[in-house]
């Protein structure tokens, strides 16, 4: 799941690998075992990786909301503070009741309460008393994308007199965040009617229609409690007393706008092409009556007709009768599973009449709504360990140093070997034990923790502008490595706090505890001074308190020494300490804003300086000619194209005439190209050396690239094993037809088999061939390869549907696998793409790149109950994408090589990979699967859910602090009905293609997790973008390195 700019709220829910599921027993049997476990590493890991980040995401959304309230209040008071409104020569006080019309030509402001004041932001350029300017063509079309739901096309011009264009964006952003919190279904409509009042033309006059008071009161009632979470009430500039209701005047047909007054609620979604859900969400009209819960409340399916041979769910969905009373929730509300006749020998009857398979009883999952399937269950049946007092706990809680059984029996008879410290671990001051590389397989000298206090260079980008450059670990938060610190909650929290400007030296303080200064002489930490900690806490703790969080316990200031202490040195900032981290942009005013907000089209600095000098050259960046995209110079000529026309990878080298250019732009002699040995450092001189050439007769001739020239392969001495090698090398499966075709050309280019090719032990075909020898048969090889079958589900019973998702039938997703490590168990989902190859996301291996600690489990549906179809393979190789960056969670993909081939069965078989040019269209429906969280727990059974593909442009609107790139796919629902949760990281997003084959298009990467309704859709790594890289890496590992 990288830590340069601070992480967006939505990213914090997608941690680097999911935690081991905290096993669930019967509620009565479990007692308080789990609640007592908060101090243990297992549950603490669950809290840090799941609950806290999700809460933090919600919290930071509220912090952002708070900042927008403050911004709007500032704009309001700046414009209204001391400037009385003059109407007909009289000075008005505060709180005038508006008639809810804004006239360009004349005023219609009521003077019933002359002591009231009209907020300046609700007036247009002409003051109400100014009748000197008539404008009969003041209406203009509404083009703002956030307000397309408005049922009218025209608004007034000029718009709000005191709200500049950038402030208008902030004004609407305030309502956008309220909308995401779902406090009132029409809150966005309310904001848009304020920003763009409907333009009504009445003869020579034009006036605007403001919201009705009842509309305002409904919005206030729904959202004031949300604002209360950040210690704000309904803003004064939105007070409802200034608006009028329709019934208060009869001489004007329409004096205010209300959603109830429109003829047909569909108009609220605009222009008739959209559908208004009962929840207030607008969806494209084409999604109505398509069998999917796009509205979150099934209102888009409520009035749809089913044919006579289909079952009509209470949700409105139509089902094949074969899916009724089969134990699976196909309707989404269990209406297809009620009042069923259960087989008493094979099925359990739930209280609502649903029948579930007997093997689901006492398996640790509550499959019945009334939980009757988990009553009177033994610990063993649920995969748990029984305490002496009958309490059930997970097996990993045994002998871990914490008493989880109330009688303490889980810590009895524990030998030294059973403790968390294993042979070879180092015992350290701040952590019970550390392995020699801090959990990392990249065991370079800087990572070595053999003496647990060795100084190492600072590599955490967040803190690379400190006045010192060496640190040692573990740090004051207990992080064992800088990589672990980079993916921690604290490395996201402090940069977000810095933006609030709560304390000038907060960033310096946070870095002194994230990357403590290391004394090069003693190897010991030099801590921050107590005063620095106390000042940071005093000024910034209140900001956390606003959203219900506490100052991190690990930063207890009493542990740090006083300044000028006689017996210990400590750190205090001097006047030259940089206030903003490298992950921030420093405004001219000194304010720090996230670097990702620099030049994003929206002013975040109070002096707007983050939107100045935004040209690529002005920011010392390289500009793509085609789309003016700005790139860092470090990605130019790095072998990975970033510009749409690949211009960043052109003209990167100047090879001689007898040389060819490698993919990384190095130069290698032509004679060395495709000679069986890698001469380019990236092995690109050995890529695509064997191909098939199709002529007009559709015969596939085997071609070999040698010294920049194509050659035919002579048939002399050819054997079937060579056809197998050729097809495998090209990634085309097994050979089905091999032919020897007579050559018609007079002087063909031949490559012939080496005389003793069988003893060469070559791994590629082209290294077994030689040039310069005659072909006696004058015949060339024609080859037809049969691709390995993929994407089939022979064991699946069709038609089924993770947060809002459903339990999946065994064998339905035979490519789904579980990436596991000891002792944690399931960490991430993964996908089988070939007999020996698996895909997952790169962030699952953050700090855990050692292949020896991983295994892959396939053919399993219930994590807690081994299956007869289950296959387990150890991991041989882990290949992370070299451009993977946690700072933006981009290039989030990795390839895993298994220790041996899988045995292909109906329950274990690979999925198909897409073609590089095969991209998903918006509003396509696909499936996600995994063992992610369903509400408040991680299920044992594999879950599945349908999701709709969302355009990248629409997706970007949900993520202000992240950039959605072409390496990503967005999927989910505006309502957040179904989306992948934490444990699904690395799991598949698959779509069914014609012929019943399933193709892998995405890997669950980041985005919305537990609060998808708040944070928008899920974000997936775009497999289509990476197909060439995937195939290249498999080829290199198979033929060039092995």
Swiss-Prot record:
Residues 268-304, 305-340, 341-377, 378-415, 579-614, 615-653, 654-689 form the LDL-receptor class A domain. GO terms for biological process: female pregnancy; peptide hormone processing; regulation of blood pressure; regulation of cardiac conduction; regulation of renal sodium excretion; regulation of systemic arterial blood pressure by atrial natriuretic peptide. Residues 134-259, 450-573 form the FZ domain. It comes from the Eukaryota. Residues 67-1042 are extracellular. Keywords: Autocatalytic cleavage, Cardiomyopathy, Cell membrane, Disulfide bond, Glycoprotein, Hydrolase, Membrane, Protease, Repeat, Secreted, Serine protease, Signal-anchor, Transmembrane, Transmembrane helix, Zymogen. Pfam families: Fz, Ldl_recept_a, SRCR_2, Trypsin. N-glycosylated; required for processing and activation. Changing residue 244 to A: Does not affect autocatalytic cleavage. GO terms for molecular function: endopeptidase activity; serine-type endopeptidase activity. It is a single-pass type II membrane protein. Residues 1-45 are cytoplasmic. The record marks 164-165, 427-428, 801-802 as: Cleavage. It is found in: Cell membrane. The active site is at residues 843, 892, 985. Its main location: membrane. Changing residue 801 to A: Loss of activity towards NPPA. Changing residue 239 to A: Does not affect autocatalytic cleavage. Inhibited in a dose-dependent manner by non-specific trypsin-like serine protease inhibitors including benzamidine. Glycans are attached at residues 80, 104, 135, 141, 231, 245, 251, 305, 320, 376, 413, 446, 451, 469, 567, 651, 697, 761, 1022. Residues 690-801 form the SRCR domain. One of its GO terms (cellular component) is plasma membrane. Initially named CORIN due to its abundant expression in the heart. It is linked to Pre-eclampsia/eclampsia 5: A hypertensive disorder of pregnancy characterized by new hypertension (blood pressure 140/90 or greater) presenting after 20 weeks' gestation with clinically relevant proteinuria. It impacts 2 individuals, the mother and her child, both of whom can be severely affected. Preeclampsia is one of the causes of maternal mortality and morbidity worldwide. Cardiomyopathy, familial hypertrophic, 30, atrial: An autosomal recessive heart disease characterized by enlarged and thickened left atrium, left atrial fibrosis, atrial arrhythmias, and hypertension. Serine-type endopeptidase involved in atrial natriuretic peptide (NPPA) and brain natriuretic peptide (NPPB) processing. Converts through proteolytic cleavage the non-functional propeptides NPPA and NPPB into their active hormones, ANP and BNP(1-32) respectively, thereby regulating blood pressure in the heart and promoting natriuresis, diuresis and vasodilation. Proteolytic cleavage of pro-NPPA also plays a role in female pregnancy by promoting trophoblast invasion and spiral artery remodeling in uterus. Also acts as a regulator of sodium reabsorption in kidney. This is Atrial natriuretic peptide-converting enzyme. The gene is CORIN.
């Amino acid at each position: 799941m990288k830590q340069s700019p601070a992480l967006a709220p939505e990213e914090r829910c997608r941690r680097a690998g999911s935690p081991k599921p905290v096993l669930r027993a019967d509620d009565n049997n479990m007692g308080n075992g789990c609640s007592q476990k908060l101090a243990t590493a297992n549950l603490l890991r669950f809290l840090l990786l799941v609950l806290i980040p999700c809460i933090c995401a919600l919290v930071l959304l509220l912090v952002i909301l708070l900042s927008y309230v403050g911004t709007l209040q500032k704009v309001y008071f700046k414009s209204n503070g001391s400037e009385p409104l003059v109407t007909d020569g009289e000075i008005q006080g505060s709180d005038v009741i508006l008639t809810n019309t804004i006239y360009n030509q004349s005023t219609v402001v009521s003077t019933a309460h002359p002591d009231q004041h009209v907020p300046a932001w609700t007036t247009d350029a002409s003051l109400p008393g100014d009748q000197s300017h008539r404008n009969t063509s003041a209406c203009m079309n509404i083009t703002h994308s956030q307000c397309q739901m408005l049922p009218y096309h025209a608004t007034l011009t000029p718009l709000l007199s005191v709200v500049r264009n950038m402030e208008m964006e902030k004004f609407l952003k305030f309502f956008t965040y309220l909308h995401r919190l779902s406090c009132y279904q029409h809150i966005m409509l309310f904001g848009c009617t304020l920003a763009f009042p409907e333009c009504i033309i009445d003869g020579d006059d034009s006036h605007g229609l403001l919201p009705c008071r009842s509309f305002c009161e409904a919005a206030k009632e729904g959202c004031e409690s949300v604002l209360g979470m950040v210690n704000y009430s309904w803003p004064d500039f939105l007070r409802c007393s200034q608006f009028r209701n329709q019934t208060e005047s009869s001489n004007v047909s329409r004096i205010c706008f209300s959603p109830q007054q429109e003829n047909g609620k569909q108009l609220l979604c605009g222009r008739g092409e959209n559908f208004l859900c009962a929840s207030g969400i607008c969806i494209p009209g084409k999604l109505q009556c398509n069998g999917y819960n796009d509205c979150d409340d099934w209102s888009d399916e409520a009035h749809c007709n089913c044919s006579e041979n289909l079952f009509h769910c209470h949700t409105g969905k139509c089902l094949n009768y074969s899916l009724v009373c089969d134990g699976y929730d196909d309707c989404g509300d269990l209406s297809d599973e009620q009042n069923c006749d259960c087989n008493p020998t094979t099925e359990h009857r739930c209280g609502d009449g649903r029948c579930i398979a007997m093997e689901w009883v006492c398996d640790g999952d509550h499959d019945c709504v009334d939980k009757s399937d988990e009553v009177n269950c033994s610990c063993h049946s649920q995969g748990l360990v029984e305490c002496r007092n009958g309490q059930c706990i997970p097996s990993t809680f045994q002998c871990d140093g914490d008493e989880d059984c109330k009688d303490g029996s889980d810590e009895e008879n524990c030998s030294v070997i059973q403790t968390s410290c294993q042979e070879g671990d180092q015992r350290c001051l701040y952590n019970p034990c550390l392995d020699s590389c801090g959990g990392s397989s990249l065991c370079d000298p800087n990572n070595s923790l053999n003496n647990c206090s060795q100084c190492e260079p600072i590599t955490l980008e967040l803190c690379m502008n400190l006045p010192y450059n060496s640190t040692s670990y573990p740090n004051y938060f207990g992080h064992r490595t800088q990589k672990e610190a980079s993916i921690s909650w604290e490395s996201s929290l402090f940069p977000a706090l810095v933006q609030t400007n709560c304390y000038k030296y907060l960033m310096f303080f946070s870095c002194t505890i994230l990357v403590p200064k290391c004394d090069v002489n003693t190897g010991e930490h030099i801590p921050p001074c107590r005063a620095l900690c106390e000042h940071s806490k005093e000024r910034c703790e209140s900001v956390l308190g606003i959203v219900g969080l506490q100052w991190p316990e690990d930063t207890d200031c009493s542990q740090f020494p006083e300044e000028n202490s006689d017996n210990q040195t400590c750190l205090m900032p001097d006047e030259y300490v940089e206030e903003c981290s490298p992950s921030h942009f420093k405004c001219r005013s000194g304010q720090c804003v996230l670097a990702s907000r620099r030049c994003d089209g929206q002013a975040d600095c109070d002096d707007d300086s983050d939107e100045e000098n935004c040209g690529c050259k002005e920011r010392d960046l390289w500009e793509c000619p085609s789309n003016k995209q700005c790139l860092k110079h470090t990605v130019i000529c790095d072998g990975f194209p970033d510009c749409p026309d690949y211009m960043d990878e052109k003209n990167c080298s100047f090879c001689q005439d007898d040389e060819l250019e490698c993919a990384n732009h190095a130069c290698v002699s032509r004679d060395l190209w495709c000679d069986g040995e890698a001469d380019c450092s990236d092995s690109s001189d050995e890529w695509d050396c064997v191909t098939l050439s199709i002529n007009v007769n559709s015969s596939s001739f085997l071609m070999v690239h040698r010294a920049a020239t194509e050659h035919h392969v002579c048939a002399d001495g050819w054997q079937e094993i060579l056809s197998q090698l050729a097809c495998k090398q090209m990634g085309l499966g097994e050979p089905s037809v091999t032919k020897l075709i007579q050559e018609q050309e007079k002087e063909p280019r031949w490559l012939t088999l080496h005389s003793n090719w069988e003893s060469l032990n070559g791994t590629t075909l082209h290294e077994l061939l030689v040039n310069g020898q005659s072909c006696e048969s004058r015949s060339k090889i024609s080859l037809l390869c049969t691709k390995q079958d993929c994407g089939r589900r022979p064991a699946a019973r069709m038609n089924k549907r993770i947060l809002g998702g459903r339990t999946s039938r065994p064998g339905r997703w035979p490519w789904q696998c579980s990436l596991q490590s000891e002792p944690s168990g399931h960490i991430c989902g993964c996908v089988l793409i070939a007999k020996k190859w698996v895909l997952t996301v790169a962030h699952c291996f953050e700090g855990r790149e050692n292949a020896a600690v991983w295994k892959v489990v396939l053919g399993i549906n219930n994590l807690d109950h081994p299956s007869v179809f289950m296959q387990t393979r150890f991991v041989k190789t882990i290949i992370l994408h070299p451009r993977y960056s946690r700072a933006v969670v981009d290039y989030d993909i990795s390839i895993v090589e298994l220790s041996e081939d899988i045995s292909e069965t109906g329950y274990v078989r690979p999925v198909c990979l897409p073609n590089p040019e095969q991209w998903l269209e918006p509003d396509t429906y696909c499936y996600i699967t995994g063992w992610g969280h369903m509400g408040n727990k991680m299920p044992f059974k594999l879950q599945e859910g349908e999701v709709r593909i969302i355009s990248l442009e629409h997706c970007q609107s949900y993520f202000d602090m992240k950039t959605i790139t072409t390496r990503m796919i967005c999927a989910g629902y505006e309502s957040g009905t179904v989306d992948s949760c934490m444990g699904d990281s690395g799991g598949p997003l698959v779509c069914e293609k014609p012929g019943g084959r399933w193709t892998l298009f995405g890997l669950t990467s980041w985005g919305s997790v537990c609060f998808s309704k708040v944070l928008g859709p899920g974000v997936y790594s775009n497999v289509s973008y990476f197909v060439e890289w995937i195939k290249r890496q498999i080829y290199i590992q198979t033929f060039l390195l092995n």
